[in-house]
Amino acid sequence: MWRGFGVLLLMLLLLSSNVWARTDTLLYPLKNIPLLSGNFGELRATHLHSGLDFKTEGREGLPVICVKEGVVARVKVSATGYGNALYLEHEGGITTVYAHLSRFSPRVAKVVRNIQYNKESFEVDENMLGYELRFHAGDTIAYSGNTGSSGGPHLHFEVRDTKTEHVLNPLRFLSVKDQTGPNVRGVYVYPVSNEGLRTSPYRVEVKNTGNRVFRGGRVCVPAGRVGIGVQSDDYMKDSWNKLGVYDLSVSANGREVFKMIMNELSFDQTFLVNELKDFHHYRDSRLVYLTFGNYQEQLLSVCNQDRGFILVEKDSVVDVVVDLSDINGNRSKIMFQLWGKFPSLEWGLAEGEKLLMNHQSDSLKKGKYTLWLEADALSHPFVCKSVVYSCVRDSVETIEVFSTGKQIYPLMKSARLQVSGKFPEKSVICLLEKNKRFSALKTRWTEEGLEASSRVLGEYTVRQDTIAPVILYMGRAGRKIRFRIADDLSGISSYRVEVNGKWCLFTYDAKNRLLEGNINEPVFVKGKNRLVLKVEDAVKNIAIFETDIYKK
């Protein structure tokens, strides 16, 4: 087993050295060396962060520059996700990505606009290599913004391997000022059964004893397997934003059982984010790295031995050392002991509970509700109790709920949920979120009833969506024409603006529910123009707004 782990570790180190060998210095994508608000490989809600987030002084419109001579390979415009995004290919086999842009440079914008009108669509995703739009290092290629799912003005920047499309750590190509090792906020020990069940973790109290060495003394735990969780973050010079950890390793009695170096990621692995973080701690705003798991070795940046678990024999003591460092080599160390003082935990099921194994397919059935899980949908075995109950919402309405547990549990593969029976037209399956809010799932009608896919276990109900989207005309502000559009349940699926019977380009900002057009679009003529806006939701409720727009 050790030989296999050694091979994996060697591969990880070779991968790291290959990245070093192939790197060349890039310019920063903003003219002044900017501060980071997010770094590569950070643990996010649904993914591992694939690039760097650069601060833009809290505003939009800063020039974004080409970091190395290259050609525009792709342009994507979306109301969500990356928003306005530009992809450039460069010599040396790398592609750089610039996202959440407010607008493109004039050369690019002209081509994109023509594509949008040809396709009659604001959202486009176009291969641009045929247009031969080449830029030199230092050229302005776009302007920073807040488009897509951005939570505030910033520039998201990525470096990718052009051939594999793997994302590479951009800090391998850029020099950064950082002289302090990662912070240690807490350490947790998770007892794990032979079946892989986890209990609530023990917290290890650690103190900084100087030189960024944190000591935690001796921790009494049940005999058996345990996993280690590390609550840590990092800072860079002149920035107070919490960043992710670059290098993290765990050793037990001098034997390395876990190693993470955030050099390279694949988009196929984004679902594994919950293999590296404690999901429930994350929901409580605590970033805890898990150094054990059944599927971590699928990540390009991780290798472990015995899945990162540490075996603590009864009455034995295990010395644990956790090493952390940033990309500049600034280090922190945690040292503590595990004492197998208590007997092994007894694991059992309460009445009505069911043990779901991660490597097996399974199903949960209660009344008219059936939920199917594929093998490897769960990251680890999970005890579940499925029930159907009624609850009162808003002191008025009683709803029926199918529950797999009060806490949401993330899945690595989507579960399939079927609700049997006859339902009113335009019914949808919804996930019941905090405060009894509904989040509609994409629902299919079948001979048996309704069916939907879900990436979490939680609580579900069925709702009928008979209300059309809401359109609010906000009037004109100079050349701008603005609308707010919203839907209360199934969500907006499409919109279309026509002026004088012809399609007109309106940008859509989904997070702010904002539609915006310009009276200088070519379909507007002098004098009176008839504008018609049609908005449709996911169950085909339609709202239409018509007005006259006058252009001088």
Q: Predicted segment positions?
A:
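Short beta-strand elements
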Residues: 328-350, 545-552
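Surface-exposed, short loops/turns at beta-strand junctions within beta-sandwich domains
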Residues: 311-317, 454-456, 520-528
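Proteolytic processing hotspots in large secreted/extracellular or virion-associated proteins
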Residues: 346, 358, 386-429
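Proteolytic cleavage junctions
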Residues: 348-363, 408-409, 422-428, 432-493, ...
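Short, solvent-exposed loop/turn segments at the edges of extracellular beta-sandwich modules
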Residues: 325-330, 536-541
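Surface-exposed, glycine-biased beta-strand/turn segments
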Residues: 20-95, 102-107, 121-131, 136-137, ...
